[in-house]
Amino acid sequence: MKILNKAFIGCLLAAGFTMTSCDYLDVIPAETTTGTDMTKDRQAALNYLYSCYGYLPTPNAGPTSLDFLTGDEVVTAFEHETFAAFPKGNYSASSPVISYWNTLYQGIRQCYMFQDELNKTGNFHGLAEKDREDYKAQVTFLIGYYHFLLSRCYGPIILVHQTPDPMLLPSDYQGQEPYDDCVNFICEKFDEAAKGLPATRTGSQANEFGLATSVAAKAMKAKMLLYAASPLFNGNSKFYSDFKDKEGKTLMPLTYDESKWSKAAAAFKDAITAAEAAGYHLYDRGDCKIKYNGYPADPHVRALRYTITDYSAEDEQAGANSEVIWADSRGEGYYGIQNKSEPYIYGGDGAWNGVAPTIAMLSRFYTKNGLPIDEDKTFDYANRWDPVEVDEAHKDEAYPGRKTQKFNLDREPRYYAWVAFQDGYYEILSASNNGAYSSDENYTLTSDNTHGRLICDFVLGGNCSRGVDANSKRTSNYSPTGFLNKKFVNPDLAKSKSGWEYTNNPWPLIRLAELYLGYAECLAETGDLTNARLYLDKVRTRAGLPGVKEAYEQFGKDPSKATTKEGLRDIIRNERMNEFYLENQNFWDMRRWLLAEKYFNVKVKGLNIDAENINDFSEVQEVVFERKFQSPMNYLMPIPSADINRNDHVVQTPGY
């Protein structure tokens, strides 16, 4: 597997001279980016460009990612880390914990400064004109994207139209602009960028994978408009009727506007057309050509497991992925999601067994018939936690002859691709020398090292449990719910007891499935249910599920649910939660749908991980970790108090 990107490696190195301690509201230029050495030649231009990307938040840095492990999808054994302040509700204006406010405005300033230098004749000797125009378009994209990230956090924001004037008086500092004006500005930036960017970066540009494209610009415009149409931002007078600037101007739209859904739908259709014309398609069974681990064997499960880990150099786009439109190709590092998710290595290190899906999330995944477990009339929901012996008919789901809960059987392929459960499988290779799992009697490794998987046992004393017995329970590196995450862990990884092995897969920021489901959501809200189901079913089909209308008519307790606006809305939302599990969506989607208070303000539930037998283990219990969400305050992020104090024109987010 070819791991990219050299561009982002350079980006991180180049960013070192730009991440200064001053903030945007101080309007102080970064002195270290001035001087002829920064504008002398083509390499200087490339370094400057990469420095502009250096302000992208790291989406998969577990300890410090705002939206990664902070929804209700998982609970972890790492609640001492910085991110845990958010699900616990322990953040405020005086202590925002993780804040984008200053960093992203620094990034915006850096982009405008680079644009200014690109527009000066004589700068960057040897830089071809086509590259100069491409760089201009890329930083225009980043200006739009950084404003988008800010608006997602804070709603109405300060709009930056040009390089800030270092001589600006505090009395002339800007305040926030009305939210709809912010949306228009961001969309204009994406439109402008799309005109100057290539649709893909392939062939000789393969080392540029991760840089902006016109398809990414169109996709991000659609995403911005989706947020603008959503309940949090569209006519939410209950929360924001008093959200006004210092002059009394209303900052949030207080009247619902259904046409915003139509506008977003048009943008999604434009992005989909551009993406498909550029060759993007949903990663499916025919794309899964990796020749290493033979597990998972089921073709649907296998394709889903590799959907966001296969960036094989065998692809037509070297190092690319047929579905991922834009990715962050910085590596996650030793303390990333892979090592934190992998089954525990007794007598070793680097596999910490600690990213645990919650029962709330696990219950969202469908049955094999493509319905929620409480809506499928063929699923024994009332007795779902009963332990049963696995028979040969379910051998691809769990190990025959051993026991698991009914809850884990007859589920959809995504469940088996991304979740490990009692006596189910964790597909991972064990290194030929000093192998991580080779000595475990529950591990299968063929003689040619091509098929490797672990049978997971979470009952106390088992290989994935909290400890070997009741007297040696670990206080870290354990699953708090009795389940483990498999998403983003490459089955081809050959793990040794030293635990240093992990793959630096690019991280999807937006992929084609998100365009299909975003379009379906917008169409459903405008009443076009037929086409909404059409695009919803594209994602369901790839997941190995029947069409939504067929599934409900044949297996649903409410056979007509997929034919009503309210029913289809609920179905599409659930589909997003399943498809984008652990992809930085849950934290924001629950907010924009105004559902965060319902789902983020409840105790996490899991199985009895202190049990010493399967019957006791099958009891559902509350996990000890605190969860708190205060409405309406926590729907948006707080602006740091220090910045409010520096700029008298900025008003604080309501509630903080």
Model-derived features with residue positions:
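Bacterial Sec-dependent N-terminal signal peptides
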Residues: 1-30
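Membrane-proximal, proline-rich intrinsically disordered regions
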Residues: 22-70, 406-409, 640-656
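Conserved, well-structured interaction surfaces
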Residues: 41-59, 79-155, 168-209, 214, ...
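C-terminal substrate/ligand-recognition segments
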Residues: 98, 393-542
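Long, intrinsically disordered, low-complexity segments
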Residues: 104, 185-187, 208, 225-226, ...
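Short coil/turn linking the two alpha-helices of tandem helical-hairpin repeats
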Residues: 151-152, 156-158, 201, 227-236, ...
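Glycine-rich, aromatic-lined ligand/substrate-binding cores of catalytic
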Residues: 300-458
